Amino acid sequence: MAASFKALPQQLTLTRSFARCYSVSAESIPAAKKKYVPTEGSYPQGFQASGILVGVKPGNKTKPDLAFLTSDRPCAAAAVFTKNKFQAAPVTFSRDLLKRRGNRGIRGVLINSGCANAVTGKGGLEDASLMAKAADEQLGGEDGAGSSTIVMSTGVIGQRLPIDKIVGNVGAAHGALGSGHKDWLACATAICTTDTFPKLMSRTFSLPSSPGVEYRMAGMTKGAGMIHPNMATLLGVVATDAPIAPGVMPSVLKHAVDRSFNSITIDGDTSTNDTVALLANGAAGGQEISSVDSPDYAAFQTVLSDFSADLAKLIVRDGEGATKFVTIRVVDSASEEAARKVASTIARSPLVKTALYGRDANWGRILCATGYALISEPGQDINEVASIVSEKTNVSFVPTDGSAELKLLVNGEPETVDEARASEILELEDLEILVKLGTGDKQATYWTCDYSHEYITINGDYRT
């Protein structure tokens, strides 16, 4: 696996006192986060990337804020979008584009940071269209099916794009395109907002039908707050040179997103702009993946799901005000849906998240969140929630340093907690909360972080 990293659990030794701002530069990356930024990569054939400064956000004079990713040949493509009812203009535009083109013939993705172009009416849709048109002109113009460029935006809601700045600089973004690591890193940096580091990964893989072919996959994502995807703001682009038919792209992406970007939460908010896109140009050759029943499809689905999960975890590690990376694992559930709801509820609980920050082994908050997770409406009879049985429920802290788990609740009965041991576990940067429901054999995993004082500071100052 190229450009990989192994983040070993460690105790926090750094207090985060830096100020977050739009788009991150190498000089501003906190020392504790630099280990997550790759220094090299293995990037898919036929793709080029760039990131340049155009000054989308007033006052930004130094940080790139326009990202351009292109393919030298048409791509099969799919995307998963936010389910927020107030969907941003680029979401509407890009969804319609993919539907119109039948998930084929995509040549590029153009992304701006600094302004979300959300809740901007017809003018916002016109701006999204102008962005795509400017990109299309650099890629040879529109074809009979119209635009071939997906557009994304991220930043403050309710403001119009400085569209002249963007459109007037797409040519410069095209001129800056390159296929090297620095080009991909510049592209990943340009989509950042309150992120403290660019989130970029790449890896190689093979497929059963073409064992001698080395395929490549690269992806970038952004997000640090407003993260509770139901595809938060969360943007992601994954590109591969594997040959994949347009008809199977939506299903393989949805499966991956459900187990990655839709399994993380920072603050429980779902953005107006969430978009995760997958592009495949087939430049590496080999047999096209055209059937969901093929061994190649299954193999690629595993690769994409694992890759997407690793990308999504980077978002959690950069959560606004976060000092801990927390895995919530719910097992022995009557259904996967119930397990996901319980894991999600625990992951979103402010009381759980603040207790983790305070290194307080207050398992009652975990149990409380578990208990109401499946109640769909006030007054619902608790006996109707058969997926949770109090006397079968177990809760533990699982350290990530290889030591034994600390049992907090066993079959509904509280354990005498070794507070010193609990404190040791909660000092770790990485930890796991394990909930065993004892009602079946299904499971689900969520990834989240804690809440610190800095979260309030960041979001209180967001527009200043």
Curated annotation (Swiss-Prot):
InterPro entries (UniProt xref): Arg_biosynth_ArgJ, ArgJ-like_dom_sf, ArgJ_beta_C
Pathway: Amino-acid biosynthesis; L-arginine biosynthesis; L-ornithine and N-acetyl-L-glutamate from L-glutamate and N(2)-acetyl-L-ornithine (cyclic): step 1/1; Amino-acid biosynthesis; L-arginine biosynthesis; N(2)-acetyl-L-ornithine from L-glutamate: step 1/4
Any single Pfam family the record assigns to this protein: ArgJ
UniProt site (Involved in the stabilization of negative charge on the oxyanion by the formation of the oxyanion hole): 154-155
EC number: 2.3.1.35, 2.3.1.1
Any GO molecular function: glutamate N-acetyltransferase activity
Domain of life: Eukaryota
Function: Catalyzes two activities which are involved in the cyclic version of arginine biosynthesis: the synthesis of acetylglutamate from glutamate and acetyl-CoA, and of ornithine by transacetylation between acetylornithine and glutamate.
Quaternary structure (record): Heterodimer of an alpha and a beta chain.
Name this protein carries in UniProt: Arginine biosynthesis bifunctional protein ArgJ, mitochondrial
